[in-house]
Structures are given as structure tokens and as C-alpha cells.
Amino acid sequence: AQRGIDVIPEIDMPGHFLAAITQYPDLACDGLIGWGETFSSPICPGKDTTLEFCQDVFKEIFDLFPYEYVHMGGDEVEKNNWKKCPRCQKRIRTEGLKSVEDLQAWFVRDMEKFFLANGKKLIGWDEVVADGLTSDAAITWWRSWSKEAVPMATSQGQRVIACPNEYFYFDYAQD
């Protein structure tokens, strides 16, 4: 802040959470830990204990970083486990959802409610733009091929942080 720069932490969930899941296997859908077809296994949003863990992680982050925004990630979620998980399927029914995509949107909205209740605003990768976030949220647009994300976010009153992958990924030329 002294130099006009805020370091905004990102704790990516519900996907990209394998480091935590490896240490706390109960965070995942039962017996479904490791790599899926494309990405690592996500947390199990069907378990209340997993939701509490996620909130506890962010409580600590909120205490450490005094900034208005905190990044929750939300990108590249492997949802195949959720299709097989009885707890996730129960959550889908209980919440009146229709699909695992709706389950992710529910999780993101639930986390945003938690953020706002704690005086913070959520930032998410552009995959969460259609999840029904409030105008308090901000979207980080990284998928330059996803042209609809920016107009969708701004039409919902959300701020957009533009960081298209081909220009802002330092390893892009080597990847």
C-alpha cells in the first residue's frame, strides 16, 4: 500500500485445491482424490465440513490482508467427481439445483455471501461470471478466447481485471 500496490491473495477453490486435499482427504468427495480427466479433484461442496474449512481458510486470509478484495479462484473445476458423489447429488437436490455446473455456481455464491458478511469482496476468474454474483464482485478475465465474459461482467455491474493469458502469463512463450 505504501507504494500504491496491494498484494491480493488468491486461494483457488473449489478446484486447484489438491495441496489441501492431499493433507485433508476428507475435503474431497469420498475416495475421489487425485487427477480427473483434465484437472485435479475439487473439494466436495456436498459436505458441510468442507464448506466450514473453506470459510476458516478465508477467515485467516481476511485477518492477514487488510484489503477490500480477496481472490477465490473458481476456475478449471473438474466436476466429474460431483456427478458420482452422493453428497454432492444430495446438495444439488436439497438446494433445488439441476446440475454440477449449478452446484459450482451455488458454492461461489455461498462463498461470496461469506465474504460480504466479513466485509470483503470476492474476485473470481472469468469462469464464475455466470454464477450469479453481486455487483460487489470483480472478475479476472484471463481466457482471451472467452469474449463474452467481459461484457457479461460489466452488464452485471462487476469490475473486470483484464489479464489475458497470452500477454500476462510469464511462461506463455515457453509453455
Predicted features along the sequence, with ranges:
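Hydrophobic faces of well-ordered beta-strands that scaffold small-molecule active sites
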Residues: V7-I11, V70-M72, L122-G124, A137-W141, ...
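A glycine-rich phosphate-binding loop feature that marks nucleotide/adenosyl-phosphate handling sites
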Residues: M13-F17, H71-V77, E127-L133, E166-D171
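Alpha-helix boundary/interfacial micro-motifs
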Residues: A20-I21, L27-C29, R91-I92, D136, ...
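Generic preference for hydrophobic/aromatic residues in regular secondary structure cores
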Residues: L27, I43-P45, W125-V128, Y169-F170
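Generic recognition of flexible, low-complexity loop/linker segments
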Residues: K59-I61, M111, D126-V128, E148-V150
